[in-house]
């Protein structure tokens, strides 16, 4: 693990950099067109009157900046949810580290910090999803003790997009 990397809470002024990393993750996941949020949207949703998410960033000192000149090199975005069976949960929406900084324990530190926050808040589970083709991420999570709920319990994740939500709500 690189002691020069600091893990800290995201600040409002980090939203542009976090959006850059969100776009990099979407590119890696082969769905760049799916990113519709703006840095203003991230700011409002994370730092407005009714915050919907929390975020951690991994930051390197200026002398260790990325090839592109960035000091924020990774992030973990999370929020709290609830299980009627288990109680409080924490959901890690994204975990991403820039490719040139991978293999240095940064992702593990980000994930560990999310777990620590969840435990401090009384959470009994930490949930997240992974694309079925992303074997490096699957192997990483399994190696850290995560359980693949699709394989182990047969759970599938569903979602309604906004138009389907509108249709459902108007029935």
Task: Specify the residue positions occupied by each region the protein language model found.
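C-terminal "cap" of GNAT-fold acetyltransferases
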Residues: 122-171
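Helix-loop element at the rim of GNAT/NAT acetyltransferase active sites that forms part
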Residues: 20-34
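A short, internal acetyl-CoA/4′-phosphopantetheine-binding micro-motif in the GNAT/acyltransferase core
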Residues: 95-102
């Amino acid at each position: 693990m690189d002691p020069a990397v600091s893990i800290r809470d995201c600040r409002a002024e980090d939203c542009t950099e976090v959006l850059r990393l969100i776009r990099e993750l979407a590119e890696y996941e082969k769905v760049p067109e799916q990113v519709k949020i703006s840095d203003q949207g991230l700011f409002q949703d994370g730092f407005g009157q009714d915050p919907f998410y929390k975020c951690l960033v991994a930051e390197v000192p200026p002398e260790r900046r990325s090839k592109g000149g960035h000091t924020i090199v990774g992030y973990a975005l999370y929020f709290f949810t609830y299980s009627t069976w288990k109680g409080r949960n924490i959901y890690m929406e994204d975990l991403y580290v820039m490719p040139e900084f991978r293999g240095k324990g940064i992702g593990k530190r980000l994930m560990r910090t999310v777990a620590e926050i969840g435990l401090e808040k009384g959470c009994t589970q930490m949930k997240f999803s992974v694309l079925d083709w992303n074997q490096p991420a699957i192997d990483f999570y399994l190696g850290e003790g995560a359980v693949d709920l699709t394989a182990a319990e047969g759970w599938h994740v569903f979602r309604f997009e906004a138009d389907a939500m509108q249709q459902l709500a108007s029935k």
